[in-house]
Amino acid sequence: MTYLEQLEEVEHYSEAGSFRRYKEVSKDLDYIISTRHPLHVQQHLLNIPNKVKEVAVGETKVSLELEYDDETIGVDFRLVEPEAFYHTLQHFTGSKDHNIRIRQLAKAQNEKVSEYGIEQQDGTLLQFQSEAEIYQHFGRHWIAPAMREDGSEFDRDLNSIITLDDIKGDLHMHTTYSDGAFSIREMIEANIKKGYEYMVITDHSKSLKVAHGLQVERLLRQNEEIKNLNEEYTEIDIYSGTEMDILPDGSLDYEDDILSQLDYVIAAIHQSFNQSEEEIMKRLEHACRNPYVRHIAHPTGRIIERREGYQPNIEQLMQLAEETQTVMEINANPKRLDLNAATVKKYPNIKLTINTDAHHVDHLDFMKYGVATAQKGFVNKDRVINTMTRDAFKNFIN
C-alpha cells in the first residue's frame, strides 16, 4: 500500500475481496486502482520491489506473487477508470451472496448492475462516486464490508452495529514490566494519540515466567506507578490491572487480597491446553465466579492456523458468563480473533469487550480487526463495555 501511495498516476486505491471483508484467512489479495494511465501504472506494478513472479499481465489486470514476511502471496491489481472505481470496488469486495442480493435489488428497478456501473433501461450507465451512493440508490444504507457475507445483512437493522469510532478505550495491553516492548508512559502516550478516554495496563501474572510475569511485589509497585501517572495525565483515565493466569488446578495466580487493590482484573488460560473439557470448564468457572475477575481473555486460546486452543464447552461458558456477569473478550489480534464472529452472533446476551492485547504501540491498530469480527457477529455497540463514556466506565469500574 505504501508503494501505491507513491504513484502519481494512481487517483484512488483500495483492498477488495475477502481481505477487505476481514475474513479470518485470505488466500490472496485484491486491489482496485483508479487511474487514467493504466499502462504507466502497470509498469510501476511490474517493478514493485518484493515481486517474486509475474502470473498474468494485461491492460486492466496485473497478477503477481509478492514476498511478505517470508511468505509468497498472490495479489491481483485491477486498473479501472476513476468513474467506475466505486462500482468495481463494491463488486470485487463481494461476497457472492451479497452481490446476488444487489443484483436482485437492481432487477426490481429494471436495472442491471456490474463492476462498471448501473445500467438503466435506456442503456445509460449510472456511475456514483462513493459506495454509500450505490447502496442509497437501492434504498439501503451503506453496509460495512465485514458484514457482506451471506445476504442476511440486508434483512437486519444495522443502525446500532458497533463501529471503530465507538471504541473509547483498550482494556488489555502489556508493557516492559512483563513481555511488552514499551513502557507504561509510552503506552499511555500511544493511547492518547488514538483518542481513547481510558485504558487498562494488564501485564502477565507471576506463574507465566516465559512472559516475565509479575511477582506480587512488582505488581503492587506497578500499581502505584500507574496511580501516579493517572494523576499526571488529565486527558485519559489510566487503570491498573493484570492478565492473571488461571492455573491448571483451577486456582488463580493472585490471592483476593491482592486483586482487591487493582482496578481491573482479567483472567486467562495460558497453559495445560490438553486438559479435558470438564477440567477446562472447572478452571473457567472458578475464574468467572471470582468477585474481582471482570473478563476472560481470548476465551478459547486459539491461534489461527497454528493451534486450536483448549476447546471449552462454549455453550456452558456463555451460560456461565451470563449468570456471573463476566465479560467475554474478542481479542483483536488478527492471529487470535477470539471469541470468533460465529460465537458472538449465537449468544447475543453476552457482554463483550474488544481489546488488542497490545505488546507494542503498533498493536493498538489491531482494534479494527476485533471490531470487524464483532460486526460479522452483528454485535450492537451497547453489548461492548469499552464503548462506554469515560464517566460511565469509571462508574462501572467502581
PLM features per residue range, with description:
Residues N191, S205-L208:
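Conserved structured catalytic cores and adjacent interaction surfaces
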Residues M1-S14:
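Helical scaffold of the NTase/Pol beta-like nucleotidyltransferase catalytic core
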Residues M199-D203, I238-G241, A297-H298:
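Short beta-strand segments at enzyme active-site cores
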Residues G241-M244, Y369:
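Active-site catalytic microenvironments in core metabolic enzymes, especially phosphate/sugar-handling
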Residues T175-T176, Y196-T202, K206:
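Ser/Thr-glycine-rich phosphate-binding loops at phosphate-binding pockets of nucleotides
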